[in-house]
Swiss-Prot record:
This is N-acetyldiaminopimelate deacetylase. PANTHER family: N-ACETYLDIAMINOPIMELATE DEACETYLASE, PEPTIDASE M20 FAMILY MEMBER. Its EC number is 3.5.1.47. Keywords: Amino-acid biosynthesis, Diaminopimelate biosynthesis, Hydrolase, Lysine biosynthesis. It comes from Listeria monocytogenes serotype 4a (strain HCC23). Catalyzes the conversion of N-acetyl-diaminopimelate to diaminopimelate and acetate. It catalyses: N-acetyl-(2S,6S)-2,6-diaminopimelate + H2O = (2S,6S)-2,6-diaminopimelate + acetate. InterPro entries: AcetylDAP_deacetylase, Amidohydrolase, Bact_exopeptidase_dim_dom, Peptidase_M20, Peptidase_M20_dimer. It is an enzyme of class 3 (hydrolase). One of its GO terms (biological process) is lysine biosynthetic process via diaminopimelate. HAMAP family: DapEL.
Amino acid sequence: MLNEFIAIRRELHQIPETGYKELKTQAYLLDYISKLPSEHLEVKKWRTGILVLVKGNNPEKTIGYRTDIDALPITEETGLPFASKHPGNMHACGHDLHMSIALGVLTHFASKPAKDNLLFVFQPAEEGPGGAKPIMESAEFAEWRPDSIYGLHIAPEYKVGEIAIKPGLLFANTSELFISFKGKGGHAAYPHLANDMVVAASAFVGQMQTIISRNIDPMDSAVITIGRIHGGEIQNVIAETAYLDGTIRTLSPETMQIVWTRLKQLAKGWEEAYQCEVEFHPGSDYYQVDNDPVETEEFIHFLEEQYPESYVPARSAMTGEDFGYFLSEIKGFMFWLGVDSEYSLHHAKLSPKEEAIPFAIDVLIHFLESK
């Protein structure tokens, strides 16, 4: 028989929605939650997200568990019979698995409450513009604010049954980068009468990499990636505007500040050198995921005792996750859950092995019961 929560994952996989547009997803989750035993449950909506409090039998604290619920603007290429029914959107980062795991854990505790309160946070907009910080600042979250909080993320590179975690920094600080260049367009035959923004933007791409090689401590780490460049509209017209879209990733907030300071200093020089206007446009900023050492070591000990073949020491990664905002104020941790897929996160053919779902549910139930 197909595991109930694998079936739920497949249903959620078909209705992927991007940040703050998760209306069908929210409705699906609310419908499922409404059918659970309600004696110990309280439910609140927050925008397109949901908070569910499971009242404990003799509570002295509140333990939080967070799952993200949004998808990516990617056209799915898996060929699965339960592929996305929303053209251009896909659960290409595993949030469908995250949700089904959270529902599995919630289902257990709705019928068998723990000693302490449990808060389940179904958070929208992790992929952007970032839902963690605003939901943390909400009155709904403040009323049930947990004393600790946990989360997971699927990892295609690990096998099913493996859990990778480490104390301290797990995910990097990330910042979206949107830059526009405005100069003077003109005829391709008369470049001396124009200010070519394709040239200006192209040169800026190369020069910004010297920030990494010459302004960042070699023992530290940072990366600037430009994933999209656009300039001009036709081949025989000098471009009046050009645009660069990318990301910055660093292992500390201080290094992120250095990168931003140098980028803005470079931009001022570019305006003089290329006779143009350079403007930075706001994007999402995600704080590093910094696992609490005591909480993490406790979880590692739990794994070694209860699931001795599962624990894998993790390495810090340059990936970003807005769960870091929770951990900046509340003790807890995030871990990687192995799903053994040949395709990476954010790939149109990502197809995680679903056996990871019942495994993760079992681990989390036993861990939370041990708290």
